[in-house]
């Protein structure tokens, strides 16, 4: 987001889903070893991308397959969509979920608190603070009940919910951001037919999220965010997670 804003002076609105599972990460954690040449300002080392065989061969393979199947050109809305070939079902979701062994509940220490806050400040709040003329629409997506089971199994469920509270509270200090929470869509979240794995949901849910934001439904404010946190805490700390695997 920060780089997009730096490279595009005319951007006036950002819509961003917050990956909840990243809130407990170290502030400088990276999901993999990223190619730095894609993110620096050196044009010359971009040859590493331009002349990379995967850059040419992988898209070529998919484009040829697309042509052989006589598909029409894609629109902006579906050119990068993978949902057409995805399977959304409880069976598929559970087949992709490796349930961790049950661990004792982790202690919430000052060190953990400080690490979470540093992550929130650096990777979420800073961009909002530094761009007061940009309207930010941030949302917590309705991750499946398998995701919540994973946090419960790892003993970090309560810490996860506290991290979400901290993030919401930090963002509410700024007038140029609206934050929406959809972790309380319990009927949707417990219906694994909406998912292909613990995190990825169908495009129908994507559409609903955009509609909810447009309607200002699920918006969290200083007046209601504690009620939201209490509701998800009550639900996920008392849920019978063994039900997921029965039937």
Identify the residue ranges that each predicted region occupies:
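Extended hydrophobic/aromatic segments used for targeting, binding, or gating
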Residues: 128, 133-136, 140, 144-192
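Extracytoplasmic/secreted proteins, especially bacterial periplasmic and envelope-associated proteins
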Residues: 55, 119-123, 162, 166, ...
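Serine-dependent acyl-ester chemistry module
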Residues: 62-119, 143-158
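Short secondary-structure boundary/capping segments
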Residues: 28-35, 152-156, 195-196
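Conserved catalytic-core segments centered on acid/base and nucleophilic motifs
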Residues: 120-128, 134-137, 199-201, 205-206
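Membrane-embedded segments
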Residues: 1-50
């Amino acid at each position: 987001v920060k780089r997009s804003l730096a490279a595009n002076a005319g951007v006036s609105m950002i819509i961003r889903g917050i990956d909840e599972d990243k809130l407990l990460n170290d502030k400088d954690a990276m999901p993999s070893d990223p190619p730095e040449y894609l993110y620096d300002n050196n044009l010359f080392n971009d040859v590493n991308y331009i002349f990379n065989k995967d850059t040419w061969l992988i898209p070529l393979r998919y484009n040829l397959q697309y042509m052989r199947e006589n598909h029409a050109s894609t629109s902006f809305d579906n050119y990068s969509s993978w949902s057409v070939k995805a399977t959304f079902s409880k069976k598929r979701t559970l087949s992709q979920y490796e349930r961790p062994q049950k661990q004792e509940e982790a202690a919430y220490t000052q060190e953990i608190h400080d690490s979470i806050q540093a992550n929130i400040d650096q990777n979420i709040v800073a961009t909002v603070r530094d761009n007061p003329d940009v309207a930010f629409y941030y949302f917590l997506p309705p991750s499946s009940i398998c995701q919540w089971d994973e946090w419960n199994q790892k003993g970090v469920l309560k810490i996860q919910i506290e991290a979400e509270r901290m993030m919401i509270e930090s963002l509410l200090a700024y007038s140029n951001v609206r934050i929406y929470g959809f972790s309380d869509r319990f009927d949707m979240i417990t219906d694994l037919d909406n998912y292909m794995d613990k995190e990825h949901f169908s495009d129908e849910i994507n559409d609903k999220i955009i509609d909810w934001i447009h309607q200002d439904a699920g918006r969290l404010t200083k007046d209601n965010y504690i009620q939201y946190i209490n509701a998800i805490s009550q639900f996920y700390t008392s849920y019978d997670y063994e039900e997921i695997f029965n039937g």
